[in-house]
Amino acid sequence: LLLAVSGGQDSMALVGLLRDLQRLHHWRLLLWHGDHGWRPDSAQQASALEGWAQAQGLPLQLERWQRPQRQEAAARHWRLEQLQRSAVQSGASRVVTGHTASDRAETLLLQLARGSHRQGMGSLRWLRPLNATVQLARPLLVFSRSETGQIQRHLQLPLWPDPSNDDPRFSRNRIRAEVLPVLEALHPGASRRLSGLSSRLADEQEGQQQLEQLALQALLVEQANPHGGLQRQALMQLEAGNRRRLLRTWLEQQGAASVSAAELERLLEQLEPQRGPGERRLPGGGRLHWTRERLHCEGGGDKPGEPPGDANWPADPHEHQP
């Protein structure tokens, strides 16, 4: 198991719990820490964390971002890329992060505020593939942030908190500090229920994806060629929600995974039966062309390095470092 460790209470609680369970499951635990270089003391903190891990007999790999950007979405992409590479090199079958039920509730509220579709609102899953051989696991989704704090204190684990988690410039931090406390005051237990809703949406999404694949197969211009185009008239005869879901899924399969919900709505308007042929640029440089009979992609769009799931539609601008 490759554990992503920031030094905060969630990831330290994760290390403590999995270390205690190691004797039962005989896991090989490897720690990974990413230094974004955002703070003058980040290298010192990384060194202190490395010293603690060595004292505990836990191997830790340090990675420093060579071209840091003060954008959480870019940082998150860098972390996932490095974690995938490290997992493959070390032979780890799972990357494990310390996301909690509190993170899930915050993500749901963020996606609701953005007008995200259901896929985004159920984005933090227990388990999902990163590539053909490595899965991403989030075993702490059953715990709230206050509970991971109790675990950290009970196990007497050290902390290296990240001040950026309190920076009000990030949307997630303001939801954590300002929005959720109001919801908890109005409806005690709101965070836990929001997390449960996100979990149910994720479960429903997995079943829905199977149905979407069957429906898309019927809409292909060439049944044996998923890149041969989509039947425009058949697509636009469907109910609006089904049109939206199937077009989004098809575009993802063509490589355009970063199309926003607003862009999707504008595209559907252009595909109405009374509108003529046209074309539209896709994220990443590809182009979508349509005649009165079919839709066709040329050049592809973005080729995402991970399956759609956590942040591709749209990306979460501030998912804390795991």
Across the structure, where does each feature detected by a protein language model lie?
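Residue-level recognition of alpha-helical structural elements
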Residues: 71, 190-193, 260
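Generic structural signal for individual residues within well-ordered alpha-helical segments
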Residues: 76, 84, 149, 195, ...
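Mid-to-C-terminal catalytic/tRNA-binding core of tRNA(Ile)-lysidine synthase
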Residues: 223-321
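Core alpha/beta nucleotide-donor-binding catalytic domains of modification enzymes
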Residues: 1-181
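Amphipathic alpha-helical interaction segments
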Residues: 104, 174, 178, 196, ...
